[in-house]
Amino acid sequence: MENVQSRMQGSRIPGLKEMNPSGTNARSRLPQPGAIANKPTAVPQLARTRSTTESTRIGAGPPSAARSVNGATKAHTRANSYANSSTLTRSASAASRPRGPLSSSTSGRPKTSMSTSRRPNGHALPRPATSLDTHQEERSYGGLGKRGEWDQDEREQNLESLFETFVSRISQQGQESSGLKDALEVYKSRVGELEEAKSEQTEQNIRLKVELDVSKSRLAEAEDALKNAQRDHEIAIDELMSRQRAECESVRYESQKSLDALKAQHESELKELRRQFERELEDEKCARVRELNQLHSKTALDAQLSQIELDKTIKELAATREDLQSLRTELDRERKNTNNLRQNLDTAASNSVTLESTISALKARIEFLESGREEQSEAFERLNQQMMDAMAETNAAKEKLRREETLRRKLHNQVQELKGNIRVFCRVRPTLENEGASDAAQFTYPDEGEDSKEINIIGPEEKSSFGTVTRKNHNFSFDHVFGPSAQNSDVFDEISQLVQSALDGYNVCIFCYGQTGSGKTHTMSSLDGMIPRAVHQIYETATSLEEKGWRYTMEGNFVEVYNENLNDLLGKAEELDKKKLEIRHDMQRGKTTITDATTVQLESPEMVESLLKRAAANRSVAATKANERSSRSHSIFILKLIGENYITGERSEGTLNLVDLAGSERLSHSGATGDRLKETQNINRSLSCLGDVIAALGQGKKDGHIPYRNSKLTYLLQFSLGGNSKTLMFVMVSPLQAHLSETLTSLKFATKVHNTHIGTAKKQTRVRDV
């Protein structure tokens, strides 16, 4: 009795586990639930999952709380019958195991055909809402069971009611078993096929597993070897790095020590040599200037005398030519008369008898005319000799003029060399209308009325820690200083001699350097700037040299360096950044060409004005905090001058480069961001490269490296910055106090350039074979 009660208390529904469905249901010989599903299968996992899901969906059924509590029969389809039968079989099989003494005599089928049991009527407890309340429900049912242990009749009554319920449901399931048999046969055949596929899949899985194990072992060995090699490599690298650091430190210490000693010795020697050289140079300059002044005055006087003699000779030659022409006309007339007389003489010969007197007269006349012709011939020969002498004198005068022109070019080049092959001019722009006078810094020009070579800048007031207010003076000296009142015409008067050197066959480079907004573009590219004035002077000089046998052809290019890329400013606007221009150098001839760049034949100065307008429209400009129209690129106007003297066969090739550099600026002042930031960085980088090139040229080393290739700007101007050229730098400064720091930086760089000597320029001429 106690055993039965304990079994009833362990079951959720009293009396369920004590019933044996195999003893009650005659059709309980079906396989154990899950036997088919648990068999090995060779089909893919997807099909197996689908089958399992479908079986679960069919056999799960709604929860028992949703079923009828009075045990009413519910209709099923064929698929539902099969699923319910399978679930019932599993429940019956699970309940058929021995549970105690009561299980041998009492048995029963599950209450429903689904996998979940129906709740019993009467005193059966309701199923919990969730599976988490199982223990609580069992505790509640255990309490009822304990109360039922003292009432044997009540227990028997419960068992009988349960038995009657099971019997009714078993009879209901018997009607559904026929459909389940047919489904079972179908599934048995399917199970056979699946078992065969499973065996094949199992063999394949075993083979793949063996291969995977082999691969894993090889991979593990390779990883171990790699880790060992990496560890050895890291150890070796650490040793090498430590050894190298030690060696570098020792070498650096020794080098610094020797360098300091050499530097001190070199500075002392350099100071002494510089003092001696400056003294000698000053003496030599004075002597050369005196000689040049004498030569200039003598040359000018000789040229004047030669010109006067030449004019006189030309006038005499013209008069002689006129006399000769009149004599020739008279001689022709006399010859015609003679011919007429001879004809008359022939006619009169037939009438000799009657015309003897006439013949005598005619003979006398003929003799007279013949004697006059001899005198005329002698006069003609005398005039012809005078003309030949005059032409010889004219040729001698022209040859003397050509020699004087050659001497002038030589003396002109010597003067330019004495002034320095690299010269620096400083120009201070005037204040604009929107800039007040109070905003200007204090500039003074100590020698403004004399040589105009010095500029003095008074810095702002600075208060020391002791309370003393001081001002710092900054003194600079250049080849020429132009104040705010200077015009472009005054500036061009100083550089016109360099333009003449380009006509003589030298490479000349004139470039403007300075911060943004300091007036570089106005100085170079305005309508009265250096570029138009230089072209006008070249045309005027070339025209005057035509009578000395020179013929010049001129061609120009206009390009810009924008973000280290070359753009053709004379090309089409839509192709500005699409054409790829390349720089080609002919090292033997010292010539530079730009591929695919537009080359324009300059036939008149007016063409230059149209070219400047087109280039200004294509040039890259943008607004910054420092300048509302700031040039964002370096523009280079390249003018090639090819001259040929058809008398002497001499040929000259010169190049004039007029460069308008983009404004140097500090990022903190310009406030550039985005594209403007990139432009500013490229501008400052190229200007720094220009300074490096000039510094390297100033060292004067014969085989020293000159970093032309560090920037497109310096690479393009390679032959115009080297020793075979004449270079002029304009440093443009702003007069405003707010720009004082940038002004001082520009002037210091200009001083560095001014102290640089780049060698002697070479004339590019050759004599044509005549």
Swiss-Prot record:
<keyword id="KW-0493">Microtubule</keyword>
<dbReference type="GO" id="GO:0000776">
    <property type="term" value="C:kinetochore"/>
</dbReference>
<dbReference type="GO" id="GO:0051256">
    <property type="term" value="P:mitotic spindle midzone assembly"/>
</dbReference>
<dbReference type="GO" id="GO:0000743">
    <property type="term" value="P:nuclear migration involved in conjugation with cellular fusion"/>
</dbReference>
<dbReference type="GO" id="GO:0000235">
    <property type="term" value="C:astral microtubule"/>
</dbReference>
<dbReference type="GO" id="GO:0030951">
    <property type="term" value="P:establishment or maintenance of microtubule cytoskeleton polarity"/>
</dbReference>
<keyword id="KW-0067">ATP-binding</keyword>
<keyword id="KW-0547">Nucleotide-binding</keyword>
<feature type="domain" description="Kinesin motor">
    <location>
        <begin position="421"/>
        <end position="756"/>
    </location>
</feature>
<dbReference type="GO" id="GO:0090561">
    <property type="term" value="P:nuclear migration during mitotic telophase"/>
</dbReference>
<dbReference type="InterPro" id="IPR027417">
    <property type="entry name" value="P-loop_NTPase"/>
</dbReference>
<dbReference type="GO" id="GO:0072686">
    <property type="term" value="C:mitotic spindle"/>
</dbReference>
<dbReference type="InterPro" id="IPR027640">
    <property type="entry name" value="Kinesin-like_fam"/>
</dbReference>
<feature type="compositionally biased region" description="Basic and acidic residues">
    <location>
        <begin position="134"/>
        <end position="152"/>
    </location>
</feature>
<comment type="similarity">
    <text>Belongs to the TRAFAC class myosin-kinesin ATPase superfamily. Kinesin family. NCD subfamily.</text>
</comment>
<dbReference type="GO" id="GO:0005737">
    <property type="term" value="C:cytoplasm"/>
</dbReference>
<keyword id="KW-0206">Cytoskeleton</keyword>
<dbReference type="GO" id="GO:0008569">
    <property type="term" value="F:minus-end-directed microtubule motor activity"/>
</dbReference>
<dbReference type="GO" id="GO:1990571">
    <property type="term" value="P:meiotic centromere clustering"/>
</dbReference>
<dbReference type="GO" id="GO:0007018">
    <property type="term" value="P:microtubule-based movement"/>
</dbReference>
<protein>
    <recommendedName>
        <fullName>Kinesin-like protein klpA</fullName>
    </recommendedName>
</protein>
<keyword id="KW-0505">Motor protein</keyword>
<dbReference type="GO" id="GO:0140641">
    <property type="term" value="P:mitotic spindle formation (spindle phase two)"/>
</dbReference>
<dbReference type="GO" id="GO:1990942">
    <property type="term" value="P:mitotic metaphase chromosome recapture"/>
</dbReference>
<dbReference type="GO" id="GO:0090619">
    <property type="term" value="C:meiotic spindle pole"/>
</dbReference>
<dbReference type="GO" id="GO:0005815">
    <property type="term" value="C:microtubule organizing center"/>
</dbReference>
<dbReference type="GO" id="GO:0055028">
    <property type="term" value="C:cortical microtubule"/>
</dbReference>
<dbReference type="GO" id="GO:0005634">
    <property type="term" value="C:nucleus"/>
</dbReference>
<dbReference type="GO" id="GO:0005524">
    <property type="term" value="F:ATP binding"/>
</dbReference>
<dbReference type="GO" id="GO:0003777">
    <property type="term" value="F:microtubule motor activity"/>
</dbReference>
<dbReference type="GO" id="GO:0008017">
    <property type="term" value="F:microtubule binding"/>
</dbReference>
<dbReference type="GO" id="GO:0140642">
    <property type="term" value="P:meiotic spindle formation (spindle phase two)"/>
</dbReference>
<dbReference type="GO" id="GO:0031122">
    <property type="term" value="P:cytoplasmic microtubule organization"/>
</dbReference>
<dbReference type="GO" id="GO:1990810">
    <property type="term" value="P:microtubule anchoring at mitotic spindle pole body"/>
</dbReference>
<dbReference type="Pfam" id="PF00225">
    <property type="entry name" value="Kinesin"/>
</dbReference>
<feature type="compositionally biased region" description="Polar residues">
    <location>
        <begin position="106"/>
        <end position="119"/>
    </location>
</feature>
<feature type="compositionally biased region" description="Low complexity">
    <location>
        <begin position="85"/>
        <end position="105"/>
    </location>
</feature>
<dbReference type="GO" id="GO:0005874">
    <property type="term" value="C:microtubule"/>
</dbReference>
<keyword id="KW-0963">Cytoplasm</keyword>
<dbReference type="GO" id="GO:0005871">
    <property type="term" value="C:kinesin complex"/>
</dbReference>
<dbReference type="GO" id="GO:0016887">
    <property type="term" value="F:ATP hydrolysis activity"/>
</dbReference>
<dbReference type="InterPro" id="IPR019821">
    <property type="entry name" value="Kinesin_motor_CS"/>
</dbReference>
